[in-house]
Amino acid sequence: MDRSRRLAVSLGLNAGLVVALVAFGIRAHSSGLLADAGHNAVDVGALALSWVAVRFALQPPSAARSFGNHRATILAALGNAVLIAGVTVLIVVDAIHRLGNPQPVHAGIVVVVASAALVVNGAAALVLNDRSGDLNMRAALLHMVGDALASLAVVVAAVVLLLAPTATWLDPVSALVVAAIIAYQAVGVLRSSVAVLLESTPSDVDLDHLTDTIGRVSGVGEVHDLHVWSLSSEMRVLSAHLVLTGHPTLEEAQVVGEHVKVAIAGPYGIAHSTLELECERCHDDDVDPCRMEGAEPPVTIHHH
């Protein structure tokens, strides 16, 4: 199942769940169920946003967007993180209010409905778990995992309420537990999204190690002006200047460039690289690099 369909299935499951949670939350006077409903309502919007982003990112590059729309999924992930933060505040405010004004809770209804919500959220999480590492899908998956954990917290609180009906404070406390889970998710997604948008070096890429890898390629004497960043969760880009040993022909320089691309593609996941190739200086006091035979330096190799 492709990502678009995974998101659509999860969207449908959660839309139906929100209606049920609101209806039974009001009937049972449960802030836990209403908090769960609020979280799921935000998730419906978040899943819709993720679905639109996936569809948008599939569009081919154009003259206006030469790299395509890969950043759309990152923007969706960032938007989801903001939505998560917003719903967290609302849940905390409501829970604090109910702690000061406890209401009787129909724990039996809460147990049944929250258990059903746990099953639905768990199923939605399994649908979204494509193990791709895509930030947009990760954000959507975290929404579902958070929902499942939130439903579990509500179930536990309701079971305790069945055994101790006077412990009405447990219901709003379960809502605060939900809020804590949601906030934790938001921080991780927000941090990763901002890192991509700021074109930070991917966290698993060591620039010194990458420089050594490139430097070990036959024909490469020096590496400088090295940059690595991400267009999306799955597309990494590199640009670098390489000083080649000796005075290679244009064809020989191109072969070195291709060998470098092969060396970095697999281990570092770099799908798009631009290499500017330079010659060694003929003498230490030379200001300009030597000219390659049959070519004007510098030679740029552009690779998709």
Question: Language-model segments: what does each one mean?
Answer:
Residues 1-5, 28, 32-34, 38, ...:
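Alpha-helical transmembrane segments and adjacent TM-loop junctions that form the membrane-embedded core
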